[in-house]
Amino acid sequence: MAAIPSSGSLVATHDYYRRRLGSTSSNSSCGSVDYSGEVIPHHPGLPKSDPGHWWASFFFGKPTHPVMTTVSESPENSGSFRITSGLVPCGLVQESVLKQKVGDTKSDSSPSA
């Protein structure tokens, strides 16, 4: 079984891969500007990214799709939808328009009193 270090965390808090051993850097993992120590040159085979945040693209990468909007079903009419903000996916718009047109033709064709 692996032992947990006394610091209680397995997350790297220093940029060891960027500095030569023996350099003194701050304990901050936020990519502070004042590093002392020799910078190791970037390997040409590796992708370049923001300093200190190479892992961020795995969790907070740029979205490939537009941001989805919140669509909620109206409690009083179980068939109607309310769009709160943003873009609407094309399929949802077409489906909503078709349902609306079918509902309008039914209400128009019914005899009025």
Swiss-Prot record:
Signal sequence segment: none
InterPro entries, alphabetized: PPDPF (IPR026754)
Keywords noted in UniProt: Developmental protein, Differentiation
Superkingdom per UniProt: Eukaryota
Entry's Gene Ontology BP terms: cell differentiation
Pfam family, one: PPDFL
Keyword Nucleotide-binding attached: no
Function: Probable regulator of exocrine pancreas development.
UniProt similarity note: Belongs to the PPDPF family.
Full protein name: Pancreatic progenitor cell differentiation and proliferation factor B
Species name: Xenopus laevis (African clawed frog)
Gene responsible for this protein: ppdpf-b
